Amino acid sequence: MLRIGHRGARAYAPENTLASFKRALEIGVDAVELDVRKTKDKQIVVIHDADVKRTTNDEGLVSELTLKEIKNLSADGEKIPTLEETLDFLDKKVKVFVELKETGIEEQVLSMVHAKGVEKNVVIISFLEDALKKIRELDKGVETGLIYAKHKNPIKAALELKANYLFALYRFTHTANVQKAHENGLKVVVWTINTPEEVEEYIKKGVDGIASDKPDILTRVNA
């Protein structure tokens, strides 16, 4: 089972920063999950929200700020990294789930993945089905995953998108869903689990990976 640090180890360091990814590596994760968006000057940065307000000392839309302006922000004492910086830092040590938070960045993200030679380490995931469709049109080989909370038929959607993973909100994930996904050749990752009891529960359900803000709870279990 994949032990995945959600936005690094966001319970212990500012989310989506190199400090957070460093902490996740120190804990001993198998993978990290991160989010990407495009700046005003078309640079791919690692940040979850469309606005920088929640995670930095300023406010404004990522899409309306240049990379230089974003680099001047403080994320609780840390800097917002670019995707390139993050891939360099992780250096193929772990699998990387890259969540596309917007459309229109698919080609750029793929180009970076190929330039760094990390195609085998990266899984591109998104709630945005159009983004996943575009990724698959551009690249038949890279792994992808459909993220969802509530979805009428996520397995059907994932198969139509030729995805490899379902990235499911944990409380809507049941043993029968996991078994059906596996029967259809899909791997199931659940997010976001932050208690040891729930970790054990979802391991028993047969999931292929768990994403946690506290990834140390994942490294304590045998799976």
Feature annotation, model-predicted:
Residues 1-223:
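Phosphate-group recognition and catalysis centered on beta-loop-alpha active-site segments
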